[in-house]
Amino acid sequence: MKLLKLSTTIIILFTFFLSLSIEARIWKDKKGNEIEAELMSIQAGKVFLKKSNGKTLRISKKTLCEADQKFLETAVPPKVKIDFSKNQDRRSDRYDIYMQCKIIITKTSSATHSGKLKATLLVIGKYERRPAFIILDKVSSKFTFNDSKTFTLEGKLFRMHDYYYSSYGQKYIGYIAIITDKNGKLVEIKSNRKEFLKDYKKIIMFRKGAVFDRKFKATTI
């Protein structure tokens, strides 16, 4: 298996298969016909619905009434791709490292999506001589794909004390980027470390500057 390397870290990208699990509702077509069913999925312009008796129906999205087509544009999250990048330099101070990170979120699915999404980026560092981690930067923003297929979330420039020169020095070890829909459900997530993906619900609760241990519990240094 070939692993894609970015800088000196291995990028691990988890793809989450979205379970819509939208409760049964009344659907209406352009002719006024109605049916009560649960939304299962949308594929290539086809809407798959499941009736209470377990029977699955396949309906063309174009045949649904305008209100139901609008509902689908916000109820079904799009497929997206996350690209992470970082810039760093020492400037004139050899004891400090300055860094700024950003993510570019690209909509890869063709279906229209007008609902709001939320992007959160956390940059994580480690105290080299102490068993603790720190949130070096955290930014989040709501956005839509109404005007563009891409959205850029840029973090703030932050400074780290080089761990080679200070017992409280830090070094960058990774990031985690999380995209959720208007209901807080996960749309996509990306990180360079397995443990961040596994415990993202704990990590996302930390504020910038928060210090935590290997079990992702708040601590002090």
Residue ranges and their predicted role:
Residues T108-G115, T144-S148, K182-K185:
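A short, structured loop/turn motif at beta-sheet edges
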Residues R159-I221:
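Acidic, serine/threonine- and proline-rich intrinsically disordered appendage/tail regions
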Residues S7-S19:
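Bacterial N-terminal signal peptides
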Residues P78-I82, F143-N146, K217-T220:
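Noncatalytic linker/hinge segments flanking ATPase motor cores
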Residues P131-F151, S191-L197:
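Solvent-exposed serine/threonine-rich low-complexity stretches and specific carbohydrate-binding patches
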